[in-house]
Curated annotation (Swiss-Prot):
Molecular function, one GO term: DNA polymerase processivity factor activity
Gene coding for it: pcna
Name of the protein described by the UniProt record: Proliferating cell nuclear antigen
Pfam families reported for this sequence: PCNA_C (PF02747), PCNA_N (PF00705)
Compartments (UniProt record): Nucleus
Species this chain originates from: Dictyostelium discoideum
Gene3D superfamilies registered for this protein in UniProt: 3.70.10.10
DNA-binding region ranges: 61-80
Record's subunit section: Homotrimer. Forms a complex with activator 1 heteropentamer in the presence of ATP.
Gene Ontology biological process terms from the UniProt entry: lagging strand elongation; leading strand elongation; mismatch repair; regulation of DNA replication; translesion synthesis
Length: 258
């Protein structure tokens, strides 16, 4: 028997809105430690890594590990039925069951909605994610990254990210011209942590990425006030959003090779 209860159904709704345009279906791997999801987009350029730890749920019960293969499009539609303040309970009987149940309850418990989604068989691929010693780690307001991607996508399709101790520069060029946006580390100690930019740089790094993917990642902005970009030459950038005390949503994007 698997059952997990979230105080905010809106959290899972925001997660699905962030990934459903990249991946059509995926396995939610449930274990006593929590729920995880790893999935590659159709072009094999982006890897999604979602971790929701058991201690972040109001209640969490998982007798044994099981995988719930779900259509993310269908799940996203059902989650839209949840009110912003509703709680969410997820139930699955065992590996023999072909459905998973989602229950939404209003704060006053005067409205309860339950939906069953049929499970689908998805080949379960596990990707090895190695911890790297990155050349540059940039922590910045997530809304700022979203704005940068939105502004620069008007001009070009490939963004060059250059990072060093002095700042991080986002550059694009296209048929109509070029553009650059530079973000410097926050020096004012009075700026709240969730509004400050912090750059840890061991050595300068310059990488090119498809802007459309970075723009897609920023759909996760409502999940967290901050985003972390971890970069090193020749390996995927990691764009990570911390989800309160529940876990994190990370995107790995391979650089464009000229």
């Amino acid at each position: 028997m698997f059952e997990a209860r979230l105080l905010q159904a809106s959290l899972l709704k925001k997660i699905l809105e962030s990934i459903k345009d990249l991946v059509e279906s995926a396995n939610f791997d449930c274990s006593p430690e929590g729920i995880s999801l790893q999935a590659m987009d159709g072009t094999h350029v982006t890897l999604i890594n979602l971790v929701l730890r058991n201690e972040g749920f109001e209640t969490y019960n998982c007798d044994r590990s099981l995988s719930l293969g779900l259509s993310l499009v269908s799940l996203s539609k059902i989650l839209k039925c949840a009110g912003n303040d509703d709680t969410l309970t997820i139930r699955a009987r065992d590996n023999e069951s072909d459905t998973v149940t989602f229950v939404f309850e209003s704060p006053k418990n005067d409205r309860v909605s339950d939906f069953e989604i049929k499970l689908i068989d998805i080949k379960n691929e596990q990707y090895s994610i190695r911890k790297s010693d990155y050349s540059a780690v940039i922590k910045m307001p997530s809304a700022e990254l979203q704005r940068i991607c939105r502004d620069l996508s008007i001009i070009g399709e490939i963004v060059t990210i250059s990072a060093n101790k002095e700042g991080v520069k986002f550059s694009v060029s296209g048929d109509s011209g070029s553009g650059n946006i530079t973000i410097k580390p926050t020096s004012d100690s009075d700026v709240p942590a969730e509004q400050a930019t912090v750059i840890e740089s061991k050595e300068p790094v310059v990488l090119n990425f498809a802007l459309k993917f970075l723009s897609n990642f920023t759909k996760a902005t409502p999940l967290s006030p901050m985003v972390t970009l971890s970069m090193s030459e020749g390996i995927p950038v990691v764009v990570e959003y911390k989800i309160d005390d529940l876990g994190f949503l990370g995107f790995f994007l391979a650089p464009k090779i000229e």
